[in-house]
Amino acid sequence: MNTPAQLSLPLYLPDDETFASFWPGDNSSLLAALQNVLRQEHSGYIYLWAREGAGRSHLLHAACAELSQRGDAVGYVPLDKRTWFVPEVLDGMEHLSLVCIDNIECIAGDELWEMAIFDLYNRILESGKTRLLITGDRPPRQLNLGLPDLASRLDWGQIYKLQPLSDEDKLQALQLRARLRGFELPEDVGRFLLKRLDREMRTLFMTLDQLDRASITAQRKLTIPFVKEILKL
């Protein structure tokens, strides 16, 4: 695990969730937009939505990693873990190079948090320098926010839906993750996993990591019989 150059919260980000490890599928235009915002020297805003497990957090982690490697100060705020901190943690974030707010749907109906996000958004607009990336599980207008002005602000910028991966893309994503971890996932084994397991990517990646560890321990290559043995299928 690694820590970006600056985090406003005591959190660690996964060092394997980068743009290089993200299989885009039908999301090439989204990736291009994200990287364009990160390259520019002035502020930019993107709202990204998708169901849980589609890769929203991966992309925010990747954005933080890219800018922190350049020495820029970044902030990552996972609102699904907001019980760990208070809204005042957002104070001063308009001075960072990048602010990533994850899972904004989690604060719907929470007056203090909605106002804190709204105020931060306005400060970032005034600063003109901070890049802002926000994710949710639905479009801004469908978030059931209690503060109409916040819903309006979130609807201003570029809005993208993270498209789900096809089965072929999921296979490619699994093989990419395997290569980055230093081993090969045979195509027949990958297709077997897609056929027999929950196809949610987080589950597939966790299973792949489990198989990697088992393969190292047993000093065996990944084959369908070995996978059946380890996963008790």
Curated annotation (Swiss-Prot):
Disulphide-bridged cysteine pairs: none
Impact reported for residue 153 to A/M: Defective in DnaA-ATP hydrolysis, binds beta clamp normally, no growth at 30 degrees Celsius
Outcome of mutating residue 6 to A: Severely impaired in beta clamp binding and DnaA-ATP hydrolysis, very poor growth at 30 degrees Celsius
InterPro entries according to UniProt: Chromosome_initiator_DnaA-like, DnaA_dom, Hda, Hda_Enterobact, Hda_lid, P-loop_NTPase
Region Beta clamp binding motif: start-end pairs: 6-11
Subcellular location: Cell inner membrane
GO biological process, one term: DNA replication initiation
Cross-referenced Gene3D superfamilies: 1.10.8.60, P-loop containing nucleotide triphosphate hydrolases
Entry keywords, A to Z: Cell inner membrane, Cell membrane, DNA replication, DNA replication inhibitor, Membrane, Nucleotide-binding
Biological role: Mediates the interactions of DNA replication initiator protein DnaA with DNA polymerase subunit beta sliding clamp (dnaN). Stimulates hydrolysis of ATP-DnaA to ADP-DnaA, rendering DnaA inactive for reinitiation, a process called regulatory inhibition of DnaA or RIDA. ADP-binding activates Hda to hydrolyze DnaA-ATP; Hda monomers bind to ADP with about 200-fold greater affinity than for ATP. RIDA function can be genetically separated from viability, suggesting this protein has another function as well. Suppresses the toxic effect of overexpressing a TrfA N-terminal 163 residue fragment. Inhibits inner membrane-associated plasmid IncP-alpha RK2 replication probably by interacting with plasmid-encoded TrfA.
Subunit text: The active form seems to be an ADP-bound monomer; apo-Hda forms homo-multimers that do not hydrolzye DnaA-bound ATP. Forms the RIDA complex (regulatory inactivation of DnaA) of ATP-DnaA, ADP-Hda and the DNA-loaded beta sliding clamp (dnaN). Interacts with plasmid IncP-alpha RK2-encoded protein TrfA in strain B / BL21-DE3.
Additional record remark: Starts with a CTG codon.
The protein's name in its UniProt record: DnaA regulatory inactivator Hda
Source organism of this protein record: Escherichia coli (strain K12)
